[in-house]
């Protein structure tokens, strides 16, 4: 089955270039300070903390805070093998901007080969189970390897991103991975995220300029139209109430 979108992106995307009003700047500075304090306190009590950077705008905010503050938090990313070229371009810009070397985790090639040979290269369009199997081998299993031996991990998730995240706490226990989980941007708005990006000259994915607010693997991500939910472009052929890749699904 081939899945394409008939929706046309809007001709303007004001959310990614908000007006930096006095009140907005003050709110961002206050919330950024709260994030810094939260992570500093976490580092004081937990020895091994990792941050999973997906290169979303939210994750770039956290990358900037962690590296600016020189917090002892290790950064890693998941390279699924099917990311957009713009995401790979951002990886290179992040390394140059922050003078750092990214740690990448890849899927096990045997699993990918077996999946493709059995089901086909784009089988994730054929059923929800096949899509979840693809996410599991390309994201969930590499994440488990990345988190091995860690006491906690940090994510850039926000409560306002989706109905599946509406009650997202700042700190929780991750039952799936058996460690603490911090969501420091839980109460941030999209406007505040982008305000921080522009206030601190944070590099970001150029697909955001083309109306992609949420970016995952290239075949499973599309642009959205004005007024759509910000995660409408992810697995757009599925029920929006249950769309997650498996990284943040609670048992």
Please report, for each region that a protein language model flagged, where it lies by residue.
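Nucleotide-activated chemistry modules centered on ATP-dependent adenylation/adenylyltransferase
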Residues: 2-251
